[in-house]
From Swiss-Prot:
GO terms for biological process: 'de novo' UMP biosynthetic process; purine nucleobase catabolic process. Zn(2+) 1 binds at residues 56, 58, 137, 302. This is Dihydroorotase. Belongs to the metallo-dependent hydrolases superfamily. DHOase family. Class I DHOase subfamily. The modification N6-carboxylysine is found at residue 137. PANTHER family: ALLANTOINASE (PTHR43668:SF2). Pathway: Pyrimidine metabolism; UMP biosynthesis via de novo pathway; (S)-dihydroorotate from bicarbonate: step 3/3. GO terms for molecular function: allantoinase activity; dihydroorotase activity; zinc ion binding. It comes from Methanocaldococcus jannaschii (strain ATCC 43067 / DSM 2661 / JAL-1 / JCM 10045 / NBRC 100440) (Methanococcus jannaschii). Keywords: Hydrolase, Metal-binding, Pyrimidine biosynthesis, Zinc.
Amino acid sequence: MLLKNCRIIKDNKIIEGDILIDENGRIKKIAKDIKVDDEIIDIKNSLVIPGVIDAHVHFRWGEEKKEDFLSGSLAGINGGVCFAIDMPNNKPPITTKELFYKKLEDCKKDSKINVFLNFGVTENNYLGTVEDAKAYKIFMVKSVGDLFIEDYSKLKDILNQNKLFCIHAEHKDVINENLKKYQLNSWIDHCKIRDEKSEVEAVKEVIKNLKIIDRQSNKKPHVHFCHISTKEALYLIKKVRQELKNIKITVEVTPHHIYLNKDMAEELKGFGKFNPPLREKDDNIALIKGIVNKDVDIIASDHAPHLLEDKLKNVKNCPSGIPGIETIVPLTLNLVNKGLISLFDAIRVLSKNPAKIFNINNKIEEGNLANLTIIDLKKEGKINAELFKSKAKFSPFDGWEVKGFPIYTVINGTLYEAYGCKC
């Protein structure tokens, strides 16, 4: 297959040329005016970027009514996503090797995109290693079963390892105190209970332990903070990054924490209920600035599908989480078209940095498997949840006019139409 008339993003430059993909799905040649007797796809000067990596998804293994590896991966293709990293808070949680490899087997059998798995850290299993785990996930607040670090005094020992840890940073004690003050009667109450302080104090707790490890240990953990949502937490992480010598810290944010805020809580209802919750407008602005000044390393969707009937329930019975793998690319490109970030910022947080952090090869180079996201930066259209391939056909962004869409997704050399071809 020959991709004709490409504008290829490589090393912060745009290169014009063609991409020839061989029968094994590998990039055989990148050059101008390639002549070949093969299938030719004229992509008409669209941009070809290294395959987008969504480093935070929940494909709901064990809860197939909500999503499964097939539907989740088809949603990824539709959204221009070539790689995804699935979280371990399943039912049952992925806290043993046996469950990990059972889940991995199902993933390899059913997924149409490249999916990796994180392993769940508990107070009892933290010294174990799982060779095929992409990272180790720590929940600082109640999750599923024993997938939760309840005793924060154990964090130092847990983090004192040469591992990549992904941390859900919400402080259990702050949330428990807030539960004494607030009743969950309105959508804004969800934001009050899991308030900004809960994230900030959790980040402080992790930082305190990392400083001790940095001073006293020769271990070099890498801590990746998932879905940071507040300007204060972002500032604390920026500050400590400059102080630590042997420890790497990276930061992830989501499109919903960039675009949505508390002012929208009552209007969005269940479609605005997720963890961490809606924040302030100032936090939206801080996250965008964080992308530009590189305090934010990646954007991930935290794709968390639920049954629509459950998301339409009242605030007490509505589960937290929204689908996002099909909107992550257009919402990020929309920031480019609004002049809030550059095209190269977008590629850095969607492709380049996730590849570095999680050791994923998505480079557009001869000999590599062709995992490519092809985008039309100028295409305008509406986000239409009815066109989603996810089982969760709803979104807080449904009906939003945005500019910039994925039009094709190439997975290991196979080309698929993406959402931008349909909207």
